[in-house]
Amino acid sequence: RNKDMGRESPADFTFYGGIYRDVTLHIVPAEHFALPANGAPALKVTPIVTDLAAKTAEVTVEAAVVGAQSVTFALEGQALTAPVENGTATAVFTLDHAHLWDGIDDPFLYTVSAKLDNGEEASARFGCRKFEIDPQKGFFLNGRSYPLRGVSRHQDRKDAGIALTNEMMGEDMALILEIGANTIRLAHYQHAQHFYDLCDEKGLVIWAEIPYITMHMTNGRANTLTQMEELIRQNYNHPCIAVWGLSNEITAASAVNEDLLENHRLLNELAHKLDPTRKTTMANVFMLETTSPILEIPDVNSYNLYFGWYLGELEQNDEFFDKYHADYPDRCIGFSEYGADANPQYQSSHPEKGDYTESYQCIYHEHIAKMIADRPWLWATHVWNMFDFAADGRDEGGKHGENQKGLVTFDRKLKKDPFYLYKAYWSKEPFVHLCGSRYVDRAENVTEIKVYSNLPEVSLYKDGQLVETKQGDKVFTFQLPITGKHSIEARSGEHSSVILVNKVDAPNPDYAMDNRKNVTNWFDGELDESCWSVKDNMAAAMADPKAGPILKQISDKAAAARGDVAAAVKDNPALVAMMERAMQRMTIESMLMQAGASEEDIKQLNRVLQGISKE
């Protein structure tokens, strides 16, 4: 591992190699538009909306030139000729009644062209728009409230790795647009130019960031600065980009020391020097204390929280943001990552944290989606992740080498049920979706039927007969007796969705991980209350001189299954403190189930704990 390369820091996704994007050869005459070594385009366009009410914009165009004496620029019927001074020609246009780039509603793009006397030409697309972020009101686009609600995306795919074709990128964009998202966090590195182009064309507001991840490397400063310069210079003209990301979870495996702080100060200063028109941000790991000085460096802040999945309870997400907002009313705060892994093969009538069921992923996102909707002051929120992605350090949830937090599977063939939850919240396209299409065999006599829809009323039918009509908001649940094979249909107006269910005598073992197939009750007999058991509070048991070391050994083993990042962060003092706070609320059983422990492992631990008296 090269300690001078920021991209080589540990991270919870697969690092691919090779040349996986287009390579072009440029043959140019003596007089030509420059090809900068940092990969920047020849034209740099800076549109500033100077009067939002009148829609007046000032557009500055700079051309990098070699050998020529002048450049003629053209924009919307206006032509300006400018001399070349020190390799650059500059023209300033005024657009009256400019057609604004207005997000997904109207992503209008202008094209400016430049021409040399020898006929050489260059052009660039751009958009006129105004971004504002208010700590009390959230994100604004062109003067109107425009809460950024969307997803994060890694640019890999099953059987293609990171070498996505333009067609594949178009398919990704279509899926993101289907749920009605208006923002994408492009994690955790620079993405293909074609995808930025798609975001310009479709109106998605973008968070773009460099691969400065998890662990600060003392010798990596120069590389992080180079990465930031290349990111900004190459993507400066894209109207979709609203913020530059300085780092991701950089304190997960690093202490907040002066070297780390100085690295971020320099990145922040560089970003503003290269681009005074955009804000800076960073995604902070959940255990970073809100009093940390690193939060004072970027213009706006954001946190990655996983309460209700990796640790703690769902309600802690609400509590965290409400407290932060109350404690720091002058700071802008966003929700840069949240999610729960789900293998769509796994289904349950009683889903729980750590079971990797699609059923629990629904419960998780139902809570978070409502929490977000109730807090418009969250300037941006991004589901982690739109798609399952490769994470070679992981071995969990029935799959090796995948992070399964996506709303869509790694091969893009299956939309998990929470995909439709966000469609219900964000999309204007009317629809009805019945959840649980993969939960066919059901052992319960009365089963829960869940419907996601953005329509106000849904009717449920069993075998063609009306069961019940409900009014609701996004999520509709019905309790339905079942006796055999049934066709279940949800209808709202002309929209409908159908699934099949089959009453069985016992749970289908294929719906649970191998280590949980026969779980009904962990224990056959009574527990001795004078001794420790997995039903006891985790923090209390950890404090016991005999039970504590046993539990620590097990928790370390569970962390290792989460991959390279989990192994790196386990000794982080801030994480230890966060885990201790979480343990105040949780039983040993709950912690183990969340970590994916098997039935036999939990039973065996309980036998051991039942042999240790409480002192």
Segments predicted by a language model, with ranges:
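A short, amphipathic alpha-helical segment
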Residues: T24, K423, S427, N606-K614
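Short amphipathic alpha-helical segments with coiled-coil-like heptad repeat character
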Residues: A30-N38, N118-G119, A369-K370, F389, ...
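Substrate-binding/catalytic cleft of secreted carbohydrate-active enzymes
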Residues: T60, M173-I176, T183-L414, P418-Y425, ...
